[in-house]
């Protein structure tokens, strides 16, 4: 973040907080009045606010009384009163900004203020969480508050049916994950009926852990895909070839996440490919006919040299499951595209699944920008404030803590090797454990968490491990990390959304320990014992120094490190944070500067000796800033390309919705355009009368109608002939409509037209996405010809899109013209377009029939080649 931006950001932040404090005073002034209301009178306020909105008041006009009502309802039904700083957080959310609040400051409670106020409009509010557990937990927890005010609330998780989802989306406030919301959007736009759609629009979203969702996951598109049958054995053969390569056969670029074959490597691969009869004796790897082999080789190299088991993915139940690099969570159901997942399956000797074709996709960047109003909450957003502002138009406001943070952040310790580092971590944990100080150790991978776990076991130190393998116990493990003497090892996921309370979480403990007790009196007695025990344990933990957070490696992003530190020192509790690093860590090895390396060599590191130096801390921060800046540039570049696709996606989805929501009996506009296009492609620049026979033949193939050549020859120009043809085609479709509507179902033709239009549009859109993805991957080479790849992509994507729309009209009319019912005796029998499209054969070097001016092989012919 630039000095200027920091300075500006700081001054604006102060002004916003100052202006909101004045509104807090107005809310506080209503507290006594709200406390005097009965439960019924408090609930009646919701209807009163709705009436005032109808009478012309705005949500801003109602903010003060609405926030006062929510605070009082929370005090009564949740036994929690919003602090003044939480009211400020609620105002930040309502104003479409990001509220940065430290861990333990009650973000879940803050969201209720803005959610309630915005629900009064009746357009729906989405509260977005990072996992199903939090969506369900927050709904159940906050439902007492919402229900007491007559506001409906629901949650959406991945196990709900479409009917249940539709009902949930109709609630005033909906809690769900970012994945569920975006996938429901894609699924809705693949439905064949509006009644089957589950969502009801994009009014207002509050995104919890906004940095994780809008930044960390921004590069990953959400894809709904279907399998494409192919010969999967090729992946097995290529995997065997790649495992035979030696270090001199390839170069690994860890920064750019790429692997390249050397000259020796190319020769070796060609020799091995010939031995498997995958290429001919005389051909080379880069011959036109063998280009697909380079794709398989590239993916196999990436699978072996860039992707590590238990770090980037794990093998579970015979499947490769991706691990989110930022959260450490398993991403079940997600697969890498472009054959990479198949390459990993071959590497791990698993059954290879079919490669998938994209049916629909969207990025979180473009999904969340569809909301009329967007806001977010997180404990760490300041480092990414510039990106949130530039891409999402979200300003970040740092909310003051309710109590001053007392956590001590100690300088990093750097060791020569990973082994020395882990030994130092072990020694430090022992010291903390001796004084009963609770310890949370953060690791960047499952591999490291299990390595450290084995080390602790060897020294008889009891501990809990939290990583993608054991994510089911996440909430309980992390909630008990504050118990005196407890040692918890966690990957980056670190239980975001679950508070670490010193002494332990009484509610969580009670949920587990009271399960088997049936007697009400005994349950109450046991519950009181738990409360007392937690109180005593909190005192012990505080005397020991509070929660000690240990980082075993710096992450690429400072924000992830800050999130780990932020687990300690909640609500004014004491705490400590310290990072232990080694020269073998990824960040030091890949991104550390030459200056830092030479400095460390000069200083010299003896066995088990650590370096403490403020300059090293600054150098590390500089390396992290470099990586953050690079990642931001990547995300910004991807967004520019995705915006092109997103604009086309909007057009397609709007067309789809228009088709689903309207009666479509008159096809004149569609077929008249198609007929004009066909006429132009036949006549081109020649004389109309020279092509009468070709015209009659072409339209007979397309519609099965016979055009009198003598009649056609009478016309003076092609426009007159076109009017005549359109009239004949109109008669043809009128007869077809009468026939189908006479099959006991009066509006069958309209249904047929809609279904064919939708199926054609979906089919072409799938092919279009595939073509655009190939174009995007290759367009970077245009830079070598002094052309801007983005402008080239925009230009070509537009031409291909126009071609696709024209092709859609042509294919729709053709399919409708040849449409038949499977069985006329079945009322509304299965609709069955004839499988073969009898359109005229086009040579690959001819101009494309869609009139784009491009050769067929570079336009619609590309679809055939790709598939």
Swiss-Prot record:
GO molecular function annotations of the record:
ATP binding; metal ion binding; protein-exporting ATPase activity
Q: Where does Zn(2+) bind?
A: 848, 850, 859-860
Details of cofactor binding: May bind 1 zinc ion per subunit.
**Keyword Protein biosynthesis on entry:** no
**Which ranges form a coiled coil?**
none
Indicate whether Flavoprotein appears among the record's keywords.
Answer: no
Catalytically driven reaction(s): ATP + H2O + cellular proteinSide 1 = ADP + phosphate + cellular proteinSide 2
Cofactor(s) needed: Zn(2+)
In which residues is ATP bound?
86, 104-108, 499
Q: Where in the cell is it found?
A: Cell membrane; Cytoplasm
Protein's membrane topology: Peripheral membrane protein
Q: Name one Pfam family in it.
A: SEC-C
Which UniProt key words apply to this protein? ATP-binding, Cell membrane, Cytoplasm, Membrane, Metal-binding, Nucleotide-binding, Protein transport, Translocase, Translocation, Transport, Zinc
Quaternary organization: Monomer and homodimer. Part of the essential Sec protein translocation apparatus which comprises SecA, SecYEG and auxiliary proteins SecDF-YajC and YidC.
> NCBIfam families this protein is in?
PRK12904.1, secA
Q: What is this protein's name? A: Protein translocase subunit SecA
Q: Which organism is it from?
A: Wolbachia sp. subsp. Brugia malayi (strain TRS)
The encoding gene: secA
């Amino acid at each position: 973040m630039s000095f200027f931006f920091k300075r500006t950001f700081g001054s604006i932040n102060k002004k916003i907080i100052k202006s909101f404090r004045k509104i807090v005073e107005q809310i506080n002034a209503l507290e006594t009045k709200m406390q005097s209301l009965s439960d019924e009178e408090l609930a009646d306020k919701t209807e009163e606010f709705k009436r005032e909105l109808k009478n012309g008041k705005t949500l801003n006009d109602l903010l003060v009384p609405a926030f006062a009502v929510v605070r009082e309802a929370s005090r009564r039904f949740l036994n929690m009163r919003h602090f003044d700083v939480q009211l400020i957080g609620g105002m930040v959310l309502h104003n479409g900004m990001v509220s940065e609040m430290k861990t333990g400051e009650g973000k879940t409670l803050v969201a209720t203020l803005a959610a309630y106020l915005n629900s009064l409009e009746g357009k729906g509010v989405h509260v977005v969480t990072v996992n199903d557990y939090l969506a369900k937990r927050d709904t159940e927890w906050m439902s007492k508050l919402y229900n007491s005010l007559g506001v409906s609330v629901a949650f959406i998780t991945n196990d709900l049916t479409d009917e249940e989802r539709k009902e949930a989306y109709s609630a005033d406030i909906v809690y769900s994950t970012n994945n569920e919301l975006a996938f429901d959007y894609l699924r809705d736009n693949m439905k064949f009926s509006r009644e089957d759609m589950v969502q009801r629009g994009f009014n207002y979203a509050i995104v919890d852990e906004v940095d994780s969702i809008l930044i960390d996951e921004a590069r990953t598109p959400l894809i709904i895909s279907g399998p494409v049958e192919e010969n999967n054995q090729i992946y097995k053969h290529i995997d065997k070839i790649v495992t035979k390569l030696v270090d001199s056969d390839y170069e690994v670029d860890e920064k750019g996440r790429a692997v390249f074959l050397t000259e020796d490597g190319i020769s070796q691969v060609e020799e091995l490919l010939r031995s498997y009869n995958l290429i001919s004796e005389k051909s080379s790897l880069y011959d036109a006919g063998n280009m697909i082999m380079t794709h398989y080789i590239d993916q196999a190299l990436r699978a072996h040299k860039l992707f590590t088991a238990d770090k980037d993915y794990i093998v579970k139940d015979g499947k490769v499951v991706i691990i989110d690099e930022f959260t450490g969570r398993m991403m079940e159901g997600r697969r890498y595209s472009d054959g990479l997942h198949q390459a990993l399956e071959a590497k791990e000797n698993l059954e290879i699944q079919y490669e998938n074709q994209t049916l629909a996709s969207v990025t979180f960047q473009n999904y969340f920008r569809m909301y009329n109003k967007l806001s977010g909450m997180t404990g760490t957003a300041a480092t990414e404030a510039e990106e949130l502002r530039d891409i999402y138009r979200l300003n970040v406001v740092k909310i003051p803590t309710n109590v001053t943070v007392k956590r001590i952040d100690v300088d990093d310790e750097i060791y020569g090797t990973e082994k020395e580092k882990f030994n130092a971590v072990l020694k430090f944990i022992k010291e903390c454990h001796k004084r009963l100080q609770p310890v949370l150790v953060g690791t960047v991978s499952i591999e490291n968490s299990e390595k450290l776990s084995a080390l602790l076991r060897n020294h008889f130190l009891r501990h809990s491990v939290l990583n993608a393998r054991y994510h089911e116990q996440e909430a309980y493990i992390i909630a008990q990390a504050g118990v005196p003497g407890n040692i918890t090892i966690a990957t980056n996921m670190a239980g975001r959304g679950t508070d670490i309370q010193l002494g332990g979480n009484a509610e969580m403990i009670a949920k587990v320990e009271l399960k088997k007790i049936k007697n009400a009196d005994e349950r109450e007695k046991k519950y009181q014992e738990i409360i007392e025990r937690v109180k005593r344990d909190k005192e012990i933990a505080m005397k020991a120094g509070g929660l000690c957070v240990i980082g075993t490696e710096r992450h690429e992003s400072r924000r992830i490190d800050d999130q780990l530190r932020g687990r300690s020192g909640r609500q004014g509790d004491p705490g400590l944070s310290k990072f232990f690093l080694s020269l073998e860590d990824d960040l030091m090895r890949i991104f550390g500067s030459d200056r830092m390396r030479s400095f460390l060599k000069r200083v010299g590191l003896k066995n088990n000796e650590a370096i403490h130096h403020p300059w090293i801390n600054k150098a590390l921060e500089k390396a992290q800033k470099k990586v953050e800046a690079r990642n931001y540039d990547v995300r910004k570049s991807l967004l520019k390309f995705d915006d092109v696709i997103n604009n086309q996606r909007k057009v397609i989805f709007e067309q789809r919705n228009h088709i689903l929501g309207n009666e479509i009996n008159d096809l004149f506009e569609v077929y008249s355009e198609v007929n004009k296009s066909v006429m132009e492609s036949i006549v081109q620049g020649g004389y109309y009368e020279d092509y009468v026979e070709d015209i009659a033949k072409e339209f007979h193939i397309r519609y099965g109608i016979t055009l009198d050549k003598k009649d056609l020859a009478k016309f003076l120009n092609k426009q007159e002939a076109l009017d005549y043809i359109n009239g004949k085609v109109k008669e043809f479709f009128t007869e077809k409509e009468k026939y189908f509507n006479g099959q006991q179902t009066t509006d069958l033709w309209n249904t047929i037209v809609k279904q064919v239009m939708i199926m054609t549009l979906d089919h072409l859109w799938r092919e279009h996405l595939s073509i655009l993805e190939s174009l995007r991957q290759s367009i970077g080479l245009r830079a070598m010809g002094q052309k801007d790849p983005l402008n080239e992509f925009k230009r070509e994507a537009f031409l291909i899109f126009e071609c696709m729309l024209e092709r859609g009209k042509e294919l729709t009319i053709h399919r409708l013209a040849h449409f038949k019912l499977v069985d006329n005796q079945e009322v509304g029998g299965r609709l069955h377009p004839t499988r073969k499209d009898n359109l005229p054969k086009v040579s690959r070097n001819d101009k494309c029939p869609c009139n784009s001016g491009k050769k067929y092989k570079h336009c619609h012919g590309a679809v055939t080649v790709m598939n």
